[in-house]
Regions:
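Exposed, interaction-prone extracellular/peripheral surfaces
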Residues: 1-167
Length: 167
């Protein structure tokens, strides 16, 4: 969204509130992810786990630059990159019209000759995000929308807890 539309105070007791808040979110207007990330950094006064959940249609360098202050403040940052399987695989074979959920723009697409290039660009973007996050010591998790978000979050937190015990 263009602005921060909801904020849940940090607390282990607020996890269910966080999940319900996320469940109610709808893509309604164009987003300004980088500006909102930058603006929210000042609200983190104590060490926290900062989870960014987004489709990440942003420049990887700009995104990582916006996330740097969170690391500097001692936060553990995890980026959940949420994509629909069709956004990754582009399974379409017939000419189609796509509607951008944020802008409402109608985009005609002829898949022939476009699908291969599209898949390559998406994979390159995913890999750039993964690489930049790893370099910045930020956890990167690619999430498929076919998997429930709460299940993915619990799985990540469980893996994180197991790794902490090993260290």
């Amino acid at each position: 969204d263009e602005d921060v539309v909801a904020q849940v105070p940090p607390s282990a007791k607020h996890f269910n509130v966080l999940l319900h808040t996320l469940d109610r979110m709808k893509a309604e207007r164009p987003g300004r992810l980088i500006q909102n990330i930058t603006r929210l950094a000042e609200h983190f006064k104590r060490r926290s786990i900062v989870a960014l959940i987004s489709d990440l249609y942003e420049n990887p360098e700009d995104l990582l630059e916006a996330l740097k202050p969170y690391n500097y403040l001692g936060n553990d940052v995890v980026v959940f990159h949420v994509l629909d399987p069709a956004e990754i695989d582009f399974p379409y074979r017939e000419p189609s019209r796509f509607v951008d959920l944020e802008s409402g723009e109608d985009v005609p697409v002829v898949p022939e000759g476009f699908a291969k290039q599209y898949r390559e660009l998406v994979q390159a973007h995913i890999e750039a995000l993964r690489t930049r996050c790893t370099e910045a010591r930020i956890d990167y998790v690619l999430l498929n929308t076919a998997r429930p978000l709460d299940e993915a979050l619990f799985s990540y937190l469980g893996n994180r807890e197991r790794l902490a015990r090993v260290r």
